[in-house]
């Protein structure tokens, strides 16, 4: 009896989560118009560009290497800045905790349409333990890499907002065209 109730509850939980559109985190459903795009960066082999390229591949996006093509959407990574601010201090006035900020500026260029800016900010805190001076550098590098990966995930997710903005622009243009056509007919 107890086994049947557990099986029933587990089955119900699966149905509820599947029915509401729940998906495990991981890949982002990129719009079909952006399934093939050009990834353009001033540092094509840098860690941020590699992280963005990996996230695009995980989302089944084909990356075209020919940056001269004008018929494909283009994701351009304009720049990234890292900053580090003091979040707390020890009694002796030395920094105890840093807030690390990674800001990424990018833009999506859709041929024959607009240019859409994308901005991503990722925040992390880092505890500066003076007793572990040697481990600090490697820990900071691990945190920076995680921040780059998180920024790359956010950029790929923001492609959905670009797609929505593009559709909205097309709908407004179609509505304006219909209004103009109806005025001419009258």
Swiss-Prot record:
What is the recorded name of this protein?
LPS-assembly lipoprotein LptE
Mention any one GO cellular component term assigned to this protein in its UniProt record: transporter complex
Any Pfam family from its record, for instance, is LptE
One GO term under biological process is: lipopolysaccharide transport
List the InterPro entries hit by this protein, alphabetically. LPS_assembly_LptE
| Signal peptide boundaries | 1-19
Q: How does it sit in the membrane?
A: Lipid-anchor
Q: List keywords of the entry alphabetically.
A: Cell outer membrane, Lipoprotein, Membrane, Palmitate, Signal
* Gene Ontology MF terms in the entry: lipopolysaccharide binding
Task: Decide whether keyword Lipoprotein is in the record.
Answer: yes
Q: How does it assemble?
A: Component of the lipopolysaccharide transport and assembly complex. Interacts with LptD.
> What family does this belong to?
Belongs to the LptE lipoprotein family.
Top-level taxonomy: Bacteria, Pseudomonadati, Pseudomonadota, Gammaproteobacteria, Enterobacterales
Q: Lipid anchor (S-diacylglycerol cysteine) at which residues?
A: 20
Q: Which gene encodes it?
A: lptE
Reported function: Together with LptD, is involved in the assembly of lipopolysaccharide (LPS) at the surface of the outer membrane. Required for the proper assembly of LptD. Binds LPS and may serve as the LPS recognition site at the outer membrane.
Subcellular localization: Cell outer membrane
At which residues is a lipid of type N-palmitoyl cysteine covalently attached? 20
């Amino acid at each position: 009896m107890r086994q049947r109730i557990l099986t029933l509850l587990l089955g119900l939980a699966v149905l509820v989560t599947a029915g509401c559109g729940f998906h495990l985190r991981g890949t982002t459903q990129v719009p079909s118009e952006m399934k093939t795009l050009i990834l353009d960066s001033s540092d094509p082999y840098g860690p941020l560009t590699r992280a963005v390229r990996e996230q695009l591949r995980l989302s089944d996006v084909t990356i075209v290497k020919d940056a001269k093509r004008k018929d494909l959407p283009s994701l351009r990574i304009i720049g990234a800045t890292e900053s580090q601010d003091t979040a707390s201090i020890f009694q002796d006035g030395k920094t105890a905790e840093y807030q690390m900020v990674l800001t990424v500026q990018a833009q999506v260029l859709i041929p024959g349409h607009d240019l859409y800016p994308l901005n991503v900010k990722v925040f992390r805190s880092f505890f500066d333990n003076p007793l572990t001076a040697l481990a600090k550098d490697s820990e900071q590098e691990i945190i920076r890499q995680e921040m780059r990966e998180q920024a790359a995930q956010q950029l790929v997710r923001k492609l959905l907002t670009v797609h929505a903005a593009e559709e909205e622009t097309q709908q407004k243009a179609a509505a304006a065209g219909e209004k103009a056509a109806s005025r001419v007919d009258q």
